[in-house]
Amino acid sequence: MKTFTWTLGVLFFLLVDTGHCRGGQFKIKKINQRRYPRATDGKEEAKKCAYTFLVPEQRITGPICVNTKGQDASTIKDMITRMDLENLKDVLSRQKREIDVLQLVVDVDGNIVNEVKLLRKESRNMNSRVTQLYMQLLHEIIRKRDNSLELSQLENKILNVTTEMLKMATRYRELEVKYASLTDLVNNQSVMITLLEEQCLRIFSRQDTHVSPPLVQVVPQHIPNSQQYTPGLLGGNEIQRDPGYPRDLMPPPDLATSPTKSPFKIPPVTFINEGPFKDCQQAKEAGHSVSGIYMIKPENSNGPMQLWCENSLDPGGWTVIQKRTDGSVNFFRNWENYKKGFGNIDGEYWLGLENIYMLSNQDNYKLLIELEDWSDKKVYAEYSSFRLEPESEFYRLRLGTYQGNAGDSMMWHNGKQFTTLDRDKDMYAGNCAHFHKGGWWYNACAHSNLNGVWYRGGHYRSKHQDGIFWAEYRGGSYSLRAVQMMIKPID
């Protein structure tokens, strides 16, 4: 600033002191940011002296003080100050505006850069999200296409099943019509058969003769290879006598035989005081694995009962409903006895139709029949299911499929009602219980008669086949030595 002031003072001093050059003029050539010369007249250059001063470029940053005399100095001062100040103000204003604009631009550019970065980041995220959504859309389209295919397949299956059901319904209706016609035919034939039977009975009654039931085969078609017959062993033909049995239902006294030793080798009687259990299988599961007398109470029964549980046969848990061992108990009984049961639990006994019905209908049971002949040979017949219908259906027998080595002599009785001497429900014109001397699910009449007369020695002589026989094993003229009927829940 001091240098600039000193320079201006020298300049004005030279302008005032112009004695050796009259009427001369001078021009100051200022070198600024934009340097330009002043044009001079060629004529005057020849007459006048001209001085050119090179002044270093300075920027006026404060007030300028000029001390000079005369009108020319004042004019020059005004010219310099006004022009420079105006120029400086313009420059400063312009630079300030530019600086402000640049500052705004810088700020805006910074914000824009940040926003651009954020937008780029968001763009990348959006692109990734759009890609994910696009992939999900493709998966959904594929899944819906698969679902539509599955739906079409299911619809086709439903249509096929519906068609089959309609066909089955049509066939069922046709079968119903055929069944109704066949039922009418059977009823008509039954009426005709009944009339013919009555006529035959009247004819036979006039002739004072007796109708005997049909006899089963004396020797079975299929005999076990190890079986040996002893036709010479013919014992007496007597039925067991029971002192408490009504005399009017007893057969003649010449049909009895004395008891023999039990072939099943019953151990000393064991009484189990725990319980009651619903069957012998439940007792075995409770830890009782010894054969003996147990207290059993079936579901929905009025009270408990005592019966024999057989655990010696693997795997045990068998409930014995009938047992024949030595002929000590009379099985030629009436309906009430067979309904309630009779005999000795540790020997021969019949559990009772009502008790058997309660047991067999509380669960799904199977039936095992063990047979023993007089040669100590044991065979068995097992049926996959067993149950009785209620008394209103006269304890109708329902059996499953057969397996075993004794032959199937029980299936012929499947679906038949129980018959006793005083309740005839068999398919024969007469009373099968009268001829076979015991209660059973007779057809017309029997292929098995396990409640018949116990004969010693095997083969027996009798007018009717009234022994304990299994037609497919030893035939109808061979009385077995021992029999057990047992049931157990299906595994």
UniProtKB/Swiss-Prot annotation:
Domain Fibrinogen C-terminal, first and last residues per copy: 271-491
Alphabetical list of Pfam families matching this protein: Fibrinogen_C
Glycosylation sites: 160, 188
Stretches assigned to coiled coil: 80-168
Record localization: Secreted
Annotated tissue distribution: Highly expressed in adrenal gland, placenta, thyroid gland, heart, skeletal muscle and small intestine. Weakly expressed in testis, ovary, colon, pancreas, kidney and stomach.
GO molecular function: signaling receptor binding
Signal peptide as annotated in the record: 1-23
Gene3D superfamilies recorded: Gamma Fibrinogen, chain A, domain 1
Keywords on record: Coiled coil, Disulfide bond, Glycoprotein, Secreted, Signal
GO cellular component: collagen-containing extracellular matrix; extracellular exosome; extracellular space
GO terms classed as biological process: blood coagulation; cell surface receptor protein tyrosine kinase signaling pathway
S-S pairs: 280-309, 432-445
InterPro entries listed in its UniProt record: FIB_ANG-like, Fibrinogen-like_C, Fibrinogen_a/b/g_C_1, Fibrinogen_a/b/g_C_dom, Fibrinogen_CS
Principal location class: secreted
Origin: domain of life: Eukaryota
Protein name listed in UniProt: Angiopoietin-related protein 1
